[in-house]
Amino acid sequence: MADLITVARPYAEALYGLAKESGQEQAWADALQALAAMIADVQAQAFLTDPERADAEKVSLLSAVPVAVDVKAWKAFLALLIHNDRWPATAEIGTLFADAMRRAEGVVDVLVTSAIALDAGQKTAVQSALERRFAGHKVAFREAVDAALIGGLVIHTGDLTIDASVRGQVQQLARTLRS
């Protein structure tokens, strides 16, 4: 199966559009979170992967998730997930949906990974650079440390990854030399 984020994106975008239209963004986010929790269960996964089970049975199982959204739209979404065998991407759909909600609120979530922990001055500099890069948006900054980067930073937000690490530069050089 294709990368789950890639598979999830059109579903998340369509659901977000529907939710926004009806003013039920949070209710849909909650429903997706509950659905992802159910699908994470080993027994539910066994049921959903059982080739002897009809799609209607699988939709019925997933319909047991209590939701505060339009039931007809919810069941249509579940039927689509089952029919297209996209239920494994449910957690990613929920994540992308939540990302869309935050973007609509003007917030960009950014993960900054560095080889060593950033000091206060470095954090301020990175935060300022990110706010310039994402002008008009509030930047929610998270930090991680990965010594394998050797030095520099990797900045990740949504589909955008900026690899300014020593490891990334070495890998790029190796690819260039091989070609």
Curated annotation (Swiss-Prot):
Transmembrane spans: none
InterPro entries: ATP_synth_OSCP/delta_N_sf (IPR026015), ATPase_OSCP/d_CS (IPR020781), ATPase_OSCP/dsu (IPR000711)
Membrane topology: Peripheral membrane protein
Molecular function terms, GO-annotated: proton-transporting ATP synthase activity, rotational mechanism
Subcellular location: Cell inner membrane
Superkingdom of source: Bacteria
Similarity comment: family membership: Belongs to the ATPase delta chain family.
Identification of the protein by name: ATP synthase subunit delta
